[in-house]
Amino acid sequence: TQSPSSAASDVYKRQVQEMPGFIGNPMGTINRNDGGYSNTNWYFSSNWATGVNDEISQGNLDANIQLQYNYYPSTNGLFIHTETTFLNTLSGNYHLIVYLIRNDVVSPQKMNDGTIDHHYHHHAVLSNNINGTWGTLVNDSAVVNGDVFYHDFSFELPDSSTDSTYEVNNLSLVTYICERNNFNILQAIKTELGN
């Protein structure tokens, strides 16, 4: 059998092969748009601001996401309620994805000069996926302006008494709508918990 780390590495390699143009870090995609290095999806960090501004300036808001949550400290229970409204007529395979983020985690980090900073502050640490790798199917055909979809999720937060970085005031949810065929993100929101 294959080890989990080897299996994860194989998945990563396949995903990178599906997105040609990646030559190394720091590179990233901006909503899977062409226009990066050699007109691929991959942008060097020096071009991220321009790519993001270009994406924002298009002004195409196709969906609106609203999120409310209830947190019960006695059980670490988190109940998430979402409302997604489509603002245009679209055709595609739309999924709602919800991530749990730790806002600040102090942990060792190897620095550029080779030293280790044992008290490095890592920000926006992806900590869990509330509803699976590709989230929850919202609609896999046409949607029209005004279509509304509701979804509810329950999740048990890790115990903050064993890892204080899971204190509810250090947590956020990042929620987004993704078109699964081309991976474009229609809308994303961040909701801070406990505040």
Go through the PLM ranges and name each one.
Residues 5-195:
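Short, conserved sequence motifs used for protein processing/export or organelle targeting and
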Residues 1-2:
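Short, well-ordered junction/capping motifs at the entry into regular secondary structure
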